[in-house]
């Protein structure tokens, strides 16, 4: 039973009438452009074929009822006429409540909804299960009540909910790609203007995501430190963000900067340039150049931004040794564990899977999880 059938069946069973709509919003993986989003830079993610699915129907009152199928059918219920506050014990509820609360501030021309939610985006793997949920919930209200909101506004609404209601700092990339993703394409996103350009993916290439299953511990504190270091760098150049600093300007005065800050700045500037070039390489189907750019990106994250861990570097080395120059691999996500992403010709996927299975656990003592994905469509009815 797929997620649509599962949520529709559960909806009828619990609420006693059929759902009128089923909405999906995908998770994502970022192909290149790491820690560039909060520096007003460029990112190149694609939506993946793992998603949050919500079967739903409008109500004729002001009540919102929600069932979380993946949490033993836990329920939440709240009124649109009372202040929406955080739920004490159900963290998943706060993503739903936060999205609805922030939607009210944007456009409150909507009434109650019944919904059943289920998803298969792996949680804690850095594949944006939370953004997928936020965008799915926003799309439910937009579709059921014909709200005049576009994908970018639904994405911004989800980001606000996560930052201000759930209390977790995040850039805009995750929500934007979930809302605007295009099948068989990646999206080059300008995080300053939120402009997005669809970039066609080469045919016969798989998007492979491998979770190192190394438990991330430093990610929160170190993420904030990196942001501060980048802001320090921007201030040094008297610019609003590192997006506005050229590599030439940086190289001319790099020795005057604090050495650690200089390394952080060099990563962001070089990564921005790589991301823009990667979009063009991908569009031309030049997997060899894309692979070189991904390798440079990984080295920069390891040596200049210092956010990789030995387990991730091991995983990258195993994949690279197997594919040579026929594709690319790098760490993806915030760092300190998480996943690597690889672009691999489909016929090489079994060899990569076998090499990783034989070597990774033997070298690290941890078993990986292997996902073969396709670039998929953004949020909408399914």
From Swiss-Prot:
Which residues make up the binding site for Mg(2+)?
130, 162
- List, in alphabetical order, the Gene Ontology terms for molecular function in this entry: ATP binding; galactokinase activity; magnesium ion binding
Indicate where this protein resides in the cell.
Cytoplasm
> What's its EC?
2.7.1.6
Active site (catalytic residues):
174 (proton acceptor)
| Pfam families registered for this protein in UniProt | GalKase_gal_bdg, GHMP_kinases_C, GHMP_kinases_N
GO cellular component terms attached to this protein's record: cytosol
Q: Has keyword Glycoprotein? A: no
The enzyme's first-digit EC class, named in words, is transferase
Task: List positions binding substrate.
Answer: 34-37, 223
Site feature: Transition state stabilizer: 28
Q: Which pathway is recorded for this entry?
A: Carbohydrate metabolism; galactose metabolism
Q: Does the keyword Magnesium apply?
A: yes
Query: Keywords of this protein's UniProt record, alphabetized?
Result: ATP-binding, Carbohydrate metabolism, Cytoplasm, Galactose metabolism, Kinase, Magnesium, Metal-binding, Nucleotide-binding, Transferase
| Stated role | Catalyzes the transfer of the gamma-phosphate of ATP to D-galactose to form alpha-D-galactose-1-phosphate (Gal-1-P).
The entry's family comment says: Belongs to the GHMP kinase family. GalK subfamily.
Indicate what this protein is called per its UniProt record.
Galactokinase
Q: Which gene encodes it?
A: galK
